[in-house]
Amino acid sequence: MRSTPPTRQRVSRPRVALLSTVLWLPVLAITALGCADCVRVAGAAEAWPQFMFDACHSGDAADRDVDPERLGLVATASLGDAILTSPVVAEGRVFVVDGSGRCGAFDAATLAPLWSHVTRGGPQNVNNVASPAVAGPYLHVAAASGWHTVLDRATGAVVRELDLAEPVMGTPLVGEDRVYVVTLGARVHALAFDGTPQWTWDFVREVVGFDGDRWSGAAWLAARGERVTWKDHFVSSRDASLFGRTLVIPAGGRTVFLDDTGAASRLRAVGVIPGYDGNEFPATFGQSVDAAGNVYVQWHRRDNAGRTDILRLEGDEARPAGVVPGTETNIRMEGLLSFAPVAIRDGIVFRTRPQQGRGLCRHRPDAAEPEVLSERPSVAPPVLTSRHVLHAGLDGTLDIVPLGGGPATSLGTGGPITAPVAVADGRVYVPCEDGRLYLFAPEPRAVPRGTSAASAAAVTDESTTPPPDLTTIRSPLTGPRAGAEHDWYTNYGNFAGQNANDQGLEPPLRMRWARRLEGTVKHLPVCGGGRLYTHTAEGQIIAVEQDTGRLLWRRHFPDVFLSFTSPAYVDGLLLVPQAGLKRSLVRCLDAATGALRWEAPFTGSPSWSRQFPPVVHGRVAIYASGSGEYAAQGSEKFFTFGGEPVPAPDDREVMSFIYSNDNPYYPRDHRPRVWAWDLDTGKLRWERDFSEVGRGGNDCGLCILDGKLYYSVFFGYDAAARARRGLPAGANGLTACLDPLTGDTIWQTTDHYVTSKCTLSGRDGRLYIGGFNRARAGTDDRHVWCLDARDGRLVWRSEAVTSALNVVSVGERFLFSNALRGRGNVFDRDTGAVVHSILTNYACCRFTLSEPYVLGANMDMIDLSADGRLVSTGPAIDSRECLGAVVSNGRIFYTSQASGFVVSQTYGPDSAALPPVWEVRPQR
């Protein structure tokens, strides 16, 4: 991978620094031939009418220019919430919408406020990511509340309000004489510029073949009679595109081509991404169309597997037209996914991703490897001008990179930038998650270079609204289970690893809120302090309100690589293990603000199974992993997860970072390690190395029970093979009881241990151990073991099971474990006998137990008290089956592994009392 010369920093930035920026583009007119023609009347102000400049979302503004050397910070304007949308510009005014649905109009030269309008929905109208769009004299604003508002952009007066009855997360598309709006539920609304409805079209009805309530699990169960699958996936959470009079819509993992025939619509084709690392419908994370009508789809199917494919409409068929070189990713490659639309010019693709060292790349059709233009991680689409590409980073910095080579100019803001910038008349408008819109322009009143952006914002804020305190919870949880004792505060619910609770769960289930996520996740939702926390595999840590999903803060740390690890909430702190090929750190953050308290190094790879974060006893945080050397692809078969091994120099044993589930042995430099740090300072309290017993360490588990620390680790099932390799052959694994304050061993046994892809759990003086591998060579049987926590003595061994994946869930009434592509089993807690089984046949689903129900992928709800009867299923918002839902504080929370989506549901009586914002009418 080639790189451009290093970035030239314009200013120092303690947290944020002074900016200078980019360009802007002209008013656009959609033609029947392509995306748009950029037309400009002599002397008229330039316009940037919609997201990524044109309705194709090509990001290509070739006739615009900026002079980075002359740009300075002229003004900022504060709204009431984080800005997650792109600004638009028309006739000397700039318009932007914040996360809470407030639309502000400002003078384009000064950011002096002109008018503002709050869209309908009240306090629940949050998670607004749909950018506004200019259509003639009107401004179209689509809201998460399900209201679509048409405003007079000169005065802010309401021209029309349309109740679309479900959220909108994609920007309105402005065509020649129409505006198109696609809802989250994949309904398409065609409107006149003034908002007069023209026609509607429904993907769920016409393509999926479902006529019921698409947001109701009971309705899906009644219609299907079984659980929903990837074939029922339907949501449209990303931005659609428009080419001439053909809409190109990402919906349910497919690409829909829909013609506007005037009085109605006509379905042209439904495009499907070819099979690659699976055949299920993938998630679209970004979509763009070039001037020739080629559709660029950035997609993800599973576990970092994705790329940018090109689809082309030929007649009434959508055909694959190639893959953008250098965009392919999977678990055997060092690259991370992209989560944004690409920008395109003359067949050359500009693409961002949240990966340090590869943040912005240029992909030429004749080059196998991309060229790195900026190392800065990003989830925002790039924007092209005549001589530069504008690249917005998760660290709040805007890079203006010369297309012809040479150093970039870097400009700072006060928070992450997650939406594309707008450019007009040589000015650059930057939306920021600190709640401000930044204006950089070649003006004499620009803030002197060297001024920090935080200070500059304070003296240049033209808004009458004070800077918002974004981290404050505005809609706190209420109800009898809102207290901390009902928090699901770590991946397995509590530090005993029980993966179970009883919070009165009962049908019916009802949607409460939905939000978009620019990342992939392998852990369960974690809650505490009224917030829900998410750690993406690419290194973002995100906190949102539990009641509404409103963004509170976002932090990104570089060099995190496929870290499928969970946060843990304890006493106002958040502990997050962040692993990577270059370095791995446990980080402690202030849970209320995201401020870093301390960080401490660890080694090894979490791989598939070690999702758990540290456990905490008193003021001691304890974590376990392995050590050793890693690469994206390992050096021999049993160190890899598919693909051809890559031999290492000097016959070194190198493990894949995401390695095999078949583990006869581990590399000789893998040492099982346990660390303990002071929770308040991060100072190392003690450390243990169990390599005298065996080699391994990454396939392990921890739990705290009755004031003791329990640790279990797998060394591989084949003792003879280990002996031939010169490794300790005496034990296939270890389970130990330790003093959590000192690390001293109280007892240990090598008779019973986790066998990978599983942690251990404890309750009522007993430990429960499972796993995916066989325990020893010569048998294919797997078992669940129950040990006496006092001395490690075996209490019972279950009958043979397919596997016991992730964790043995230990409730007050039920003992449950899941199997990979097999039966989930309910065990008698006194004998280990299988009481009954449920044919879940999921992949690696992380079930949870909220008695008497287990919760699976797509919010599946299975009643263990009724012999595994399926009670509710769907909506199918994810095409993968890796994660289940959790019940915390009287609510259900679900994060999709593959589709970049987070939802909350209510249940029982609350399902009537706490409806989603898009079902509450009227709202004013």
Predicted regions and their residues:
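A short beta-strand motif characteristic of beta-propeller blades
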Residues: 72-77, 112-122, 157-162, 197-201, ...
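N-terminal secretory signal peptides that target proteins for export/translocation
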Residues: 1-16
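Bacterial N-terminal signal peptides
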Residues: 17-36
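Short loop/turn segments that connect beta-strands within beta-propeller blades
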Residues: 107-111, 152-156, 192-196, 259-263, ...
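Bacterial Sec signal peptide processing site at the extreme N-terminus
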Residues: 36-44
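Repeat-blade elements of multi-bladed beta-propeller folds
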Residues: 45-55, 80-103, 120-149, 162-189, ...
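Extracellular/periplasmic ectodomains of large secreted or surface enzymes and adhesion receptors
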Residues: 433, 441-494, 501, 897, ...
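Blade/loop signatures of beta-propeller domains
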Residues: 44-72, 475-511
